[in-house]
Amino acid sequence: MSKRSKAYRAAAEKVDRDNLYTPLQAAKLAKETSSTKQDATVEVAIRLGVDPRKADQMVRGTVNLPHGTGKTARVAVFAVGEKAEQAQAAGADIVGSDDLIEKIQGGFLDFDAAIATPDQMAKVGRIARVLGPRGLMPNPKTGTVTPDVAKAVADIKGGKINFRVDKQANLHFVIGKASFDEKALAENYGAALDEVLRLKPSASKGRYLKKITVSTTTGPGIPVDPSITRNFAEA
């Protein structure tokens, strides 16, 4: 067995699989069970009671995490003229139009999020098959198709995350790093969960939050009580 697998097993032994932890307890345990010396990413996985094959049960949204993600996202912006200048001033990592599209068609994908002004979307549509599967396609519903590119860049740089239910009815998103204080992780979790709950489709019947786990990138999954979104005071 590798050292990594031994570390993982040791970490997994700290998790009571039959217990449902509060968000704060889960955040603390995620920090303790990170099986890497690097500053691991803390992630949330949620199984939703929806049928993503039906358009009226799609769950997709954005949320600004109060404590950010611990990573400064690289942002690409499709814009020209004054809007391009505003995007650059706001801190966009790469700004362009046809030139940026050609670069992406050539294999360039060194960015974490993409924003476009509405007038650029007809052009951006040419690379939808490249950006879409990677979750990078600008979309009005996530605030990434907008004339206010400066605000969109600032939001993403400041810790805005996007989430979308997959074909198996799962949601995945980041709430920070293992180096974060557990209260900060729990507050990020609470902010994201509040938005997921707000977006519950009216067509969704039965239990909406079926299963929630918190983990670091290489650590074991920690089951969280779906009935609790905010519990910051508990030690």
Curated annotation (Swiss-Prot):
GO molecular function: rRNA binding; structural constituent of ribosome; tRNA binding
CC per GO annotation: large ribosomal subunit
One Pfam entry name: Ribosomal_L1
One of the GO BP terms on file: translation
Keyword terms, alphabetized: Repressor, Ribonucleoprotein, Ribosomal protein, RNA-binding, rRNA-binding, Translation regulation, tRNA-binding
Classification via InterPro entries: Ribosom_uL1_bac-type (IPR005878), Ribosomal_uL1 (IPR002143), Ribosomal_uL1-like (IPR023674), Ribosomal_uL1/biogenesis (IPR028364), Ribosomal_uL1_3-a/b-sand (IPR016095), Ribosomal_uL1_CS (IPR023673)
NCBIfam families, alphabetized: rplA_bact
Biological role stated in the UniProt entry: Binds directly to 23S rRNA. The L1 stalk is quite mobile in the ribosome, and is involved in E site tRNA release. Protein L1 is also a translational repressor protein, it controls the translation of the L11 operon by binding to its mRNA.
Family of this protein: Belongs to the universal ribosomal protein uL1 family.
PANTHER family: 54S RIBOSOMAL PROTEIN L1, MITOCHONDRIAL, LARGE RIBOSOMAL SUBUNIT PROTEIN UL1M
Subunit comment: Part of the 50S ribosomal subunit.
Protein name, per record: Large ribosomal subunit protein uL1
Lineage of the organism: Bacteria, Bacillati, Actinomycetota, Actinomycetes, Mycobacteriales
